[in-house]
């Protein structure tokens, strides 16, 4: 018989330990079953370290065999070592408790490798805190049931993976996970702020941003509004415009009205109440069944940096309830004729509730496209223009969103990552050109409507049209944000997910890829309106090998389509203000602030070497004071003193026009950004290399170039429809 090593216990101690362990197991198994298993599963989906949680929640004393102290902690995947009895000991017939002990020991010997596999797979559900979901709760619950995720409707002591807020980022204080709101988004999409952001882009790229009606901000631009309208009328007496007035913070059509004359008495009253935007009314909209309608399109802002944008393939079309007529003094007050807001038309006696997606006062956007297609309309061109509108609008919003984000979640501090579903309200003109009406930070996700049974008595009736669109948007947003989903680095072309283009064997593909590899990206861009595979096809491994069952095999294909960075090459040249925001944030100095102080502005001028004999530092101080004072007088936010981002942009425009003359504004601004980024990169490299004593030699950027893009290369000014409308 081989002698045991010195580390092993004597045989007598083994017998005593085994007997003691069996007795402990017999006593513990009576109280073990349901309560222990329940406790193990309560928080198995907690965010953080799932492996550690699962190991800690196992019963501590049940089935434990006394062993010497471990010399090292087991690594990931290492099995627990269970010492065996010496062969010389006679083995008795195991009793029920001892048999349970042996099974527990064997199971725990394999538990280490199983824990990691189970926690990374479908057994560990994603946890969602829905306690702040509010009106989107019903659609969220349906989505979570379809995804088989775990909901915590009353919150949770431990962190959740995802927090679903109904109003804003600040609905609750969270330090980890993901939240479905960006800080500052509610402020950014208000009528006044959105108009200012789009106006900056219109000054830089007037042709690209002609999808937003001409707007004036009240009360600060009232005199400008009156004078400009008067000037146009004098030049063209036949011009008889109509204007629509929208309160800054209004929603659901509240406070909106139409006017023909800038000196209308109602407009004078608005000037004394609250900020508002007055816009030129679109008089020739596309009509269906003689009714005006708009489109509510859902857009997912998945990430701010890097920028990721998704658009839902279907939306809602909301109809007026009175036949449309061009506005005149007799029908200006007919809100059911001119305003498409659902919250207004629902109170019309002509509102039609329908479970059909193609009839009624609320229909799916896809049904409208089918109807237009039957009349010969180029649907791909319509989608192309809508995609372009959405990307350009988000590009206009992201600079200030970055400032809000660094203020609420400064670099280096704990905080959640953010995503958000936005509601874009778009109107199709008679010539099928899309026009942006507004952007909603909190689009309604209700899947029911109120039905008045009797005066003052309402009943909530499910809306199948709302449920069809909104549940899909929420569910697929969660699928895209799934924190446990494995990120695959191999991206197969979308064409191979089409039912008509099944993935051939690898041997058959290799020869064709050698000849057609260069055209795969072109083929991919032409598959926007493709059909998707069946559940069985989605559950197959495209590499041809065996794989684990797809946890999403029971779900339909994702209804959200990525449009950025997919089309980044076509739109990156528009991101000039985004690059200015990066400069602005760099010189803020104090974490959490949103305004640039005078010292930070001077540091910006010095580090970028913008001062000269014609622009002294005294002139820089005067520039800062004048612009900051003017912007502080018109902005509502007075939390911090200093220069806001929009004031910094105005100062940047002034410096660019002063330094680079005889160029279009966007080229002047791009040249100045290049110069600033060059000097700052040189400064950063000097700080890194100064201790090494290495000389730094870099050539300054070339400023005289024909066209500038955000990546430093030229970009086309006109985007072809075929490049955007297909995937």
Curated annotation (Swiss-Prot):
GO cellular component, one term: microtubule
Region (c-MTBD region): 464-566
Region Disordered: start-end pairs: 1-88, 530-551, 694-727
Binding residues annotated for Mg(2+) 2, in chain numbering: 438, 440
Residues that hold a protein according to the record: 252
Residue ranges with Low complexity bias: 17-34
Gene3D superfamilies named in the record: ATP-grasp fold, B domain
Protein known as: Tubulin polyglutamylase TTLL11
Organism annotation: Mus musculus
Annotated gene: Ttll11
